[in-house]
């Protein structure tokens, strides 16, 4: 395994260094080839490194940052005032080649805008999309995008997301001829917004895309599709709703029957069932899938949930490691160029169009 260097925006997220720094130490424990650049306020970071041993410290470097982009800041204002911020400096380390990826739990809009500004989109891609890979009930995986990078999406952007998601599913997740679907309010052709119907019409004309039509949100985890495409607003709401339901379900498994008097054998049976069911459904725990890749950039950027705990942020760091090792941007760029050498020129309803 080759050595990797990641830049962490340790000031981002709801909890800042109190979560991100312990998560960084956890990541170092699990990967001896990993070096981390901790970007943020040294006064807030240093006390949290007290438990780090000398070997861990040799693979850590604090990069001082002057400010933090607030989670509630408007993206346009945040970008204009971003110089010296932990988020921008972490991205600049990737741009300069000092780090191979950036991980941040900070303001999504600001991260999207700064990443696009500093790292640039791949040739032919208008706007990057946040993508994650979720488990489904058939014991496989589903690629889902966009998860919040782009609130408003036209049909061109949805088609681009479908292309990138299909390439990611085939090249990285290793799903041959992945099925692609658009998230909609029904499976009928007449359902949905104009942008969704227009994107559907274009996807039907692309031979290299295994487009299967519309899918409803209640089928997200059924395994009916390998790639699910939607606008960022819908994707973000869908993902967080699913995560909330899963957390409630897992919590109920642990707490069911507490405080009630039972005979000893019923208590033993209850505890056995709780442990068995918890193990059975533990793979659905959202913490295990924290970290969405900002797909479509020339560099690797991972967005963690703002409310991520230590375990979840450590998972986001591991997602960055895997994205770098699998050369996600390079493989997507190479595949896009080979499959769409004309710059994604398409025919849409008899009219010449482009996805640039």
UniProtKB/Swiss-Prot annotation:
GO terms for cellular component: cytoplasm. Its main location: cytoplasm. InterPro entries: FA_synthesis (IPR003664), Phospholipid_synth_PlsX-like (IPR012281). It is found in: Cytoplasm. Keywords: Cytoplasm, Lipid biosynthesis, Lipid metabolism, Phospholipid biosynthesis, Phospholipid metabolism, Transferase. It comes from the Bacteria. PANTHER family: FATTY ACID/PHOSPHOLIPID SYNTHESIS PROTEIN PLSX, PHOSPHATE ACYLTRANSFERASE. Catalyzes the reversible formation of acyl-phosphate (acyl-PO(4)) from acyl-[acyl-carrier-protein] (acyl-ACP). This enzyme utilizes acyl-ACP as fatty acyl donor, but not acyl-CoA. Belongs to the PlsX family. This is Phosphate acyltransferase. The lineage of its organism: Bacteria, Pseudomonadati, Pseudomonadota, Gammaproteobacteria, Enterobacterales.
């Amino acid at each position: 395994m080759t050595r990797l260097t990641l830049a962490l925006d340790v000031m981002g997220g709801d909890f800042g260094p109190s979560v991100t720094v312990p998560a960084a130490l956890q990541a170092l424990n699990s990967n001896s080839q990993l070096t981390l650049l901790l970007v943020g306020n040294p006064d807030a970071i240093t006390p949290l490194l007290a438990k780090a041993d000398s070997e861990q410290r040799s693979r850590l470097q604090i990069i001082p940052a002057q400010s933090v982009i607030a989670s509630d800041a408007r993206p346009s204002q945040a970008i204009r005032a971003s110089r010296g911020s932990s988020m921008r400096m972490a991205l600049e380390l990737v741009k300069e080649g000092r780090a191979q990826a950036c991980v941040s739990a900070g303001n999504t809009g600001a991260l999207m805008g700064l990443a696009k500004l500093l790292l640039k989109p791949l040739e032919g891609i208008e706007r990057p999309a946040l993508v994650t890979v979720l488990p489904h009930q058939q014991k496989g995986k589903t690629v889902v995008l966009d998860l919040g990078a782009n609130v408003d999406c036209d049909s061109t952007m949805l088609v681009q997301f479908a292309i990138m998601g299909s390439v990611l599913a085939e090249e990285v997740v290793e799903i041959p001829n992945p099925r692609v679907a658009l998230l909609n309010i029904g499976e009928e052709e007449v359902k949905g917004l104009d942008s969704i119907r227009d994107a559907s019409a274009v996807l039907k004309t692309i031979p290299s895309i295994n487009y299967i039509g519309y899918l409803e949100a209640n089928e997200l985890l059924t395994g009916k599709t390998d790639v699910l495409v939607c606008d960022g607003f819908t994707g973000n709401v869908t993902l967080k709703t699913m995560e909330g339901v899963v957390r409630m379900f897992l919590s109920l498994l642990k707490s069911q029957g507490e405080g009630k008097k039972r005979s000893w054998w019923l208590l033993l049976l209850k505890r056995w069932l709780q442990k068995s069911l918890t193990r059975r459904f533990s793979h659905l725990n959202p913490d295990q899938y924290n970290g969405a890749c900002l797909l479509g950039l020339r560099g690797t950027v991972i967005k963690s949930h703002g409310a991520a705990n230590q375990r979840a942020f450590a998972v986001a760091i591991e997602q960055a490691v895997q994205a770098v090792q699998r050369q996600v941007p390079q493989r997507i760029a190479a595949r896009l160029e080979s499959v769409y050498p004309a710059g994604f020129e398409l025919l849409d309803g008899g009219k010449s169009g482009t996805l640039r």
